[in-house]
Protein backbone atom coordinates (compact mmCIF):
# COMPACT_ATOMS: atom_id res chain seq x y z
CA UNK A 1 0.00 0.00 0.00
CA UNK A 2 2.81 2.43 0.81
CA UNK A 3 4.59 1.77 -2.47
CA UNK A 4 1.57 3.06 -4.38
CA UNK A 5 1.59 6.27 -2.36
CA UNK A 6 5.28 6.75 -3.08
CA UNK A 7 4.77 6.14 -6.81
CA UNK A 8 1.81 8.52 -6.82
CA UNK A 9 3.90 11.20 -5.09
CA UNK A 10 6.77 10.73 -7.56
CA UNK A 11 4.41 11.06 -10.51
CA UNK A 12 2.94 14.25 -9.04
CA UNK A 13 6.41 15.73 -8.52
CA UNK A 14 7.52 14.82 -12.04
CA UNK A 15 4.35 16.30 -13.46
CA UNK A 16 4.92 19.58 -11.59
CA UNK A 17 8.50 19.79 -12.89
CA UNK A 18 7.37 19.27 -16.49
CA UNK A 19 4.70 21.94 -16.20
CA UNK A 20 7.22 24.43 -14.81
CA UNK A 21 9.73 23.56 -17.53
CA UNK A 22 7.05 23.88 -20.19
CA UNK A 23 6.06 27.31 -18.85
CA UNK A 24 9.67 28.52 -19.01
CA UNK A 25 10.21 27.19 -22.52
CA UNK A 26 6.94 28.73 -23.69
CA UNK A 27 7.87 32.07 -22.15
CA UNK A 28 11.26 32.08 -23.87
CA UNK A 29 9.78 31.10 -27.23
CA UNK A 30 7.14 33.80 -26.86
CA UNK A 31 9.80 36.37 -25.97
CA UNK A 32 11.79 35.42 -29.06
CA UNK A 33 8.71 35.74 -31.22
CA UNK A 34 7.94 39.14 -29.70
CA UNK A 35 11.45 40.33 -30.51
CA UNK A 36 10.99 39.50 -34.18
CA UNK A 37 9.02 42.75 -34.18
CA UNK A 38 12.33 44.59 -33.76
CA UNK A 39 13.75 42.91 -36.86
CA UNK A 40 10.70 43.83 -38.91
CA UNK A 41 10.82 47.40 -37.66
CA UNK A 42 14.50 47.68 -38.55
CA UNK A 43 13.90 46.54 -42.11
CA UNK A 44 10.89 48.80 -42.56
CA UNK A 45 12.59 51.81 -41.04
CA UNK A 46 15.67 51.33 -43.20
CA UNK A 47 13.50 51.11 -46.30
CA UNK A 48 11.59 54.27 -45.35
CA UNK A 49 14.81 56.14 -44.54
CA UNK A 50 16.25 55.20 -47.90
CA UNK A 51 13.17 56.50 -49.68
CA UNK A 52 13.31 59.73 -47.66
CA UNK A 53 16.95 60.20 -48.62
CA UNK A 54 16.06 59.63 -52.27
CA UNK A 55 13.22 62.15 -52.04
CA UNK A 56 15.52 64.72 -50.44
CA UNK A 57 18.12 64.18 -53.15
CA UNK A 58 15.51 64.85 -55.83
CA UNK A 59 13.76 67.78 -54.08
CA UNK A 60 15.95 69.45 -51.44
CA UNK A 61 13.46 72.28 -50.99
CA UNK A 62 10.95 69.84 -49.44
CA UNK A 63 13.20 69.18 -46.43
CA UNK A 64 10.76 70.46 -43.73
CA UNK A 65 7.82 68.40 -45.00
CA UNK A 66 9.80 65.23 -45.63
CA UNK A 67 11.66 65.55 -42.34
CA UNK A 68 8.40 65.89 -40.39
CA UNK A 69 6.89 62.76 -41.94
CA UNK A 70 10.19 60.92 -41.58
CA UNK A 71 10.42 61.63 -37.83
CA UNK A 72 6.74 60.86 -37.17
CA UNK A 73 6.97 57.64 -39.19
CA UNK A 74 10.11 56.57 -37.36
CA UNK A 75 8.47 57.23 -34.00
CA UNK A 76 5.43 55.16 -34.94
CA UNK A 77 7.64 52.33 -36.22
CA UNK A 78 9.79 52.37 -33.08
CA UNK A 79 6.73 52.18 -30.84
CA UNK A 80 5.94 48.70 -32.15
CA UNK A 81 9.52 47.59 -31.47
CA UNK A 82 9.30 48.98 -27.93
CA UNK A 83 6.00 47.14 -27.40
CA UNK A 84 7.66 43.92 -28.55
CA UNK A 85 10.55 44.52 -26.14
CA UNK A 86 8.15 45.14 -23.24
CA UNK A 87 6.23 41.96 -24.04
CA UNK A 88 9.51 40.00 -24.18
CA UNK A 89 10.58 41.36 -20.78
CA UNK A 90 7.20 40.52 -19.28
CA UNK A 91 7.37 36.98 -20.63
CA UNK A 92 10.93 36.41 -19.44
CA UNK A 93 10.77 37.98 -15.99
CA UNK A 94 7.10 37.81 -14.97
CA UNK A 95 5.81 34.60 -16.58
CA UNK A 96 8.03 32.41 -14.44
UniProtKB/Swiss-Prot annotation:
Membrane topology per record: Multi-pass membrane protein
Transmembrane regions: 24-44, 75-95
SUPFAM superfamilies, sorted: F1F0 ATP synthase subunit C
UniProt entry tagged with the keyword Thylakoid: no
GO cellular component, one term: plasma membrane
Protein location: Cell membrane
Cytoplasm in keyword set: no
Site residues by UniProt (Reversibly protonated during proton transport): 78
Any GO molecular function: proton-transporting ATP synthase activity, rotational mechanism
Origin superkingdom: Bacteria
Keyword vocabulary terms for this entry: ATP synthesis, Cell membrane, CF(0), Hydrogen ion transport, Ion transport, Lipid-binding, Membrane, Transmembrane, Transmembrane helix, Transport
Pfam family, one: ATP-synt_C
HAMAP family membership: ATP_synth_c_bact
Subunit annotation: F-type ATPases have 2 components, F(1) - the catalytic core - and F(0) - the membrane proton channel. F(1) has five subunits: alpha(3), beta(3), gamma(1), delta(1), epsilon(1). F(0) has three main subunits: a(1), b(2) and c(10-14). The alpha and beta chains form an alternating ring which encloses part of the gamma chain. F(1) is attached to F(0) by a central stalk formed by the gamma and epsilon chains, while a peripheral stalk is formed by the delta and b chains.
Family: Belongs to the ATPase C chain family.
Miscellaneous comment as given in the Swiss-Prot or TrEMBL entry: Dicyclohexylcarbodiimide (DCDD) binding to the active glutamate residue inhibits ATPase in vitro.
Function summary: F(1)F(0) ATP synthase produces ATP from ADP in the presence of a proton or sodium gradient. F-type ATPases consist of two structural domains, F(1) containing the extramembraneous catalytic core and F(0) containing the membrane proton channel, linked together by a central stalk and a peripheral stalk. During catalysis, ATP synthesis in the catalytic domain of F(1) is coupled via a rotary mechanism of the central stalk subunits to proton translocation.
Protein name: ATP synthase subunit c
